[in-house]
Amino acid sequence: MPPKKKVAGLIKLQIKAGQATPAPPIGPALGQHGVNIMEFCKAYNAQTESQRGNVIPVEITVYEDRSFTFITKTPPAAELIKKAAGVEKGSGEPHVKKVANLTSAQVREIAEQKLQDLNAKDVDMAARIIAGTARSMGITVSD
């Protein structure tokens, strides 16, 4: 078994799927660790091409020899909620002004999609987390 590589850093970014470019914020974040920026952009764009239009969080592990690996996550809950509710952004005053309404079925669908990234054992708990996020954005959840 080859010796394990030493980790030099962990970078977390949220990038639109299929649209990674060397421009900020990606370039400077990777450049300070000495990573080949174009190599990352090409690999990321190829892996996320099918999810175009979504913001995809990515965790990049940089090793001391300047090589890297990355893991893509599911889109942020807030992005999925905004898409399902059909709003541009959440409410400026979440508990005063309500901007949209989601059904329990929509919340459950988002919870099933996010389950692997959430700290929840089952879909019901994940749905409660998603409903809480929606409430904090000024979006009501109805049955």
Swiss-Prot record:
Superkingdom of origin: Bacteria
One record GO biological process: translation
GO molecular function annotations of the record: large ribosomal subunit rRNA binding; structural constituent of ribosome
InterPro entries: Ribosomal_uL11, Ribosomal_uL11_bac-typ, Ribosomal_uL11_C, Ribosomal_uL11_C_sf, Ribosomal_uL11_CS, Ribosomal_uL11_N, Ribosomal_uL11_N_sf
GO cellular component: cytosolic large ribosomal subunit
Post-translational events: One or more lysine residues are methylated.
Keyword annotations from UniProtKB, A to Z: Methylation, Ribonucleoprotein, Ribosomal protein, RNA-binding, rRNA-binding
Keyword Repeat annotated: no
Gene3D superfamilies reported for this sequence: Ribosomal protein L11, C-terminal domain (1.10.10.250), Ribosomal protein L11/L12, N-terminal domain (3.30.1550.10)
Pfam families, per the entry: Ribosomal_L11, Ribosomal_L11_N
Subunit details: Part of the ribosomal stalk of the 50S ribosomal subunit. Interacts with L10 and the large rRNA to form the base of the stalk. L10 forms an elongated spine to which L12 dimers bind in a sequential fashion forming a multimeric L10(L12)X complex.
Role: Forms part of the ribosomal stalk which helps the ribosome interact with GTP-bound translation factors.
Family the UniProt entry places it in: Belongs to the universal ribosomal protein uL11 family.
Cross-referenced NCBIfam families: L11_bact
Name used for this protein in its record: Large ribosomal subunit protein uL11
Organism, scientific name: Kineococcus radiotolerans (strain ATCC BAA-149 / DSM 14245 / SRS30216)
Originating gene: rplK
